[in-house]
């Protein structure tokens, strides 16, 4: 039979191999003709490289968080794909991973420097920061760039950073300038070592310095090396630039909508001016007083983050259960007598009753905040009401709307609260004169204390349990499913909890008063 003919059999085998190769070649040809954006959409995943630090990305009590992480979530949502975060502990691995195609985007709070824009596309800037030289408080302070060449201490910077690049330029003016470049580290670590006195000086971005001072108050500013510089995401320079074009569109949209301003407010709008004495006192209180009351804060926080209730209590009484003011408010939460009665507190000096009552009163204030305000912002409006009164807070919202601002965002309303002291504004309001500036300081202090507790916990614990650690080809990833269009909860807040709760993790070893 023909089927047993060796020549026919051989021909069939060759034909089958040729057909398979042709099909594979066709698939490859088709893949090569896809744009970068089409390839990402076809794969169903956008891979975002970032740095594991307090601003860009970290794993908190409620899962992944950070400014760059939240921006990446929104970008993945725009694409309709899963988000795969690839956080690294040092800068050295980010751009090489981008170049070899291991990630699609670098999103790590990095400066647009000359060498970076020569090799990569920079998306539109999403915030600005200057370069700051820092030293330990109480030690010798360099006051101008020339002082760094006096050999009165060692200047240490992250290898390959924009800070190192700036020093290379400065060396042309100051030939005696020297420094050490450290590869396996990041700015957060260098700032910590300066605070401990293990390093003399380092350079960090102004935003990182401000955040670090909340948990390392001995970090002191020596001088500003540069003016504000743009911070951006980066992508490879490809032939079609489709991904780059979409990033330009994306950042334009979130700037126009106000989403970017709200995220910036969330992550560093609370920083404000730095008070060395207050910060030192607060950190001492975290160590000496907070452990005694932590269980009660957790017990009565319910839907709140217990650290927020703790921050509120510190603002009110400095965690002193016997605190009494000349106006008659008293206890851990400094409740007035009418407020205490309204929440069932019989003894305001009983710390458990006071904490329970304070949390319940805040809950009541939040329930009165209009549902048009997103849930994560309601608490700031409620705290302002807690301090200055609900009517005055609503006056500030109405004034914000009248001046063309967004009365539903804390970013805009907090700018109008101090105006309630001025006659030309309060005489047109429903509730008249108010010490709105004090209410603003009250809320911002609580936000700072809250973030400091979080930062303190980060600095003194590990983000990951050993059971969660899995090494896959030396690469860590956090993969999230496609983020659905953000829908309003019944209280008007936006709900992305499903995306976070179903996160799949793998880890890399990279080298009140009134």
UniProtKB/Swiss-Prot annotation:
Per the record, the domain of life is Bacteria
Membrane topology term: Peripheral membrane protein
Q: Give compartment(s).
A: Cell outer membrane
Pfam families for the chain:
SBP_bac_3 (PF00497), SLT (PF01464)
Q: Tell me the segments the record calls region Non-LT domain.
A: 31-271
> What are its GO cellular component terms?
cell outer membrane
For this UniProt record, give its keywords in alphabetical order, as a comma-separated list: Cell outer membrane, Cell wall biogenesis/degradation, Lyase, Membrane, Signal
* A molecular-function term among this protein's GO annotations: peptidoglycan lytic transglycosylase activity
Reactions that this protein is recorded to catalyse: Exolytic cleavage of the (1->4)-beta-glycosidic linkage between N-acetylmuramic acid (MurNAc) and N-acetylglucosamine (GlcNAc) residues in peptidoglycan, from either the reducing or the non-reducing ends of the peptidoglycan chains, with concomitant formation of a 1,6-anhydrobond in the MurNAc residue
Q: Which GO terms describe its biological process?
A: cell wall macromolecule catabolic process; cell wall organization; peptidoglycan catabolic process
Task: Return the Polar residues bias intervals.
Answer: 490-499
Please indicate if the UniProt record lists Signal as a keyword: yes
Leader sequence range is 1-30
Region named Disordered: 482-514
What SUPFAM superfamilies would the database entry show? Answer: Lysozyme-like (SSF53955), Periplasmic binding protein-like II (SSF53850)
Question: Top-level EC class, please?
Answer: lyase
Which E.C. number(s) belong to this protein?
4.2.2.n1
Specify where the region named LT domain lies, as residue ranges. 272-514
KW Membrane (keyword) present? yes
Q: What domain notes does the record hold?
A: The N-terminal domain does not have lytic activity and probably modulates enzymatic activity. The C-terminal domain is the catalytic active domain.
| Family matches, as NCBIfam families | PRK10859.1
**Per its database record, what is this protein's job?**
Murein-degrading enzyme that degrades murein glycan strands and insoluble, high-molecular weight murein sacculi, with the concomitant formation of a 1,6-anhydromuramoyl product. Lytic transglycosylases (LTs) play an integral role in the metabolism of the peptidoglycan (PG) sacculus. Their lytic action creates space within the PG sacculus to allow for its expansion as well as for the insertion of various structures such as secretion systems and flagella.
Q: Which family does it belong to?
A: In the N-terminal section; belongs to the bacterial solute-binding protein 3 family.
Query: This protein is called what?
Result: Membrane-bound lytic murein transglycosylase F
Organism, by scientific name, is: Photobacterium profundum (strain SS9)
Lineage, uppermost ranks: Bacteria, Pseudomonadati, Pseudomonadota, Gammaproteobacteria, Vibrionales
């Amino acid at each position: 039979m023909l089927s047993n003919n060796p020549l026919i059999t051989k021909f069939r085998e060759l034909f089958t191999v040729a057909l398979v190769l042709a099909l594979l070649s066709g698939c490859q040809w088709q893949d090569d003709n896809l744009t970068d954006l089409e390839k990402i959409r076809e794969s169903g995943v956008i891979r975002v490289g970032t740095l594991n630090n307090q601003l860009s990305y970290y794993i908190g009590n409620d899962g992944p968080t950070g400014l760059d992480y939240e921006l990446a979530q929104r970008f993945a949502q725009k694409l309709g794909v899963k988000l795969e975060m690839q956080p690294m502990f040092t800068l050295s691995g980010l751009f090489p991973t981008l170049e070899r195609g291991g990630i699609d985007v670098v999103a790590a709070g990095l400066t647009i420097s000359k060498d970076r824009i020569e090799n990569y596309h920079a998306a539109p800037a999403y915030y600005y920061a200057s370069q700051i030289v820092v030293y330990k408080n109480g030690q010798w302070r360099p006051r101008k760039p020339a002082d760094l060449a006096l050999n009165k201490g060692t200047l240490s910077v992250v290898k390959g950073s924009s800070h190192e690049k700036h020093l290379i330029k400065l060396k042309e003016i100051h030939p005696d300038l020297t420094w050490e470049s450290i590869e396996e580290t990041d700015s957060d670590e260098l700032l910590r070592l300066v605070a401990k006195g293990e390093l003399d000086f380092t350079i960090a971005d102004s935003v990182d310095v401000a955040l670090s001072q909340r948990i390392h108050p001995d970090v002191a500013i020596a001088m500003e090396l540069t003016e504000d510089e743009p911070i951006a995401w980066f992508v490879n320079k490809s032939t079609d630039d489709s991904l780059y074009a979409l990033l330009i569109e994306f950042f334009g949209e979130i700037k126009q909508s106000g989403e970017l301003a709200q995220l910036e407010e969330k992550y560093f709008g609370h920083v404000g001016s730095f008070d060395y004495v207050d910060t030192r006192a607060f950190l001492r209180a975290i160590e000496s007083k907070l452990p005694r009351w932590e269980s009660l804060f957790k017990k009565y926080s319910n839907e709140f983050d217990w650290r927020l209730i703790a921050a509120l209590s510190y603002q009110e009484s400095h965690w002193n259960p016997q605190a009494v003011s000349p106006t008659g408010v008293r206890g851990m939460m400094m409740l007035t007598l009418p407020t205490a009665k309204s929440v069932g507190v019989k003894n305001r000096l009983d710390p458990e009753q006071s904490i329970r009552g304070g949390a319940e009163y805040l809950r009541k204030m939040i329930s009165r905040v209009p549902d048009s305000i997103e849930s994560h912002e309601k608490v700031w409006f409620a705290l302002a009401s807690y301090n200055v009164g609900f009517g005055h807070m609503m006056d500030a919202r109405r004034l914000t709307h009248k001046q063309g601002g967004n009365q539903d965002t804390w970013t805009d309303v907090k700018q109008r609260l101090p105006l309630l002291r001025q006659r030309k504004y309060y005489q047109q309001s429903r509730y008249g004169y108010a010490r709105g500036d004090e209410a603003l300081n009250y809320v911002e202090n609580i936000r700072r204390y809250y973030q400091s507790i979080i930062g303190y916990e980060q600095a003194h614990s590990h983000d990951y349990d050993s059971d969660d650690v899995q090494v896959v080809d030396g690469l860590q990833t956090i993969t999230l499913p496609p983020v659905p269009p953000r829908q309003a909860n019944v209280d008007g807040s936006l709900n992305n909890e499903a995306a976070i709760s179903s996160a799949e993790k793998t880890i890399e070893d990279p080298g009140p008063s009134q």
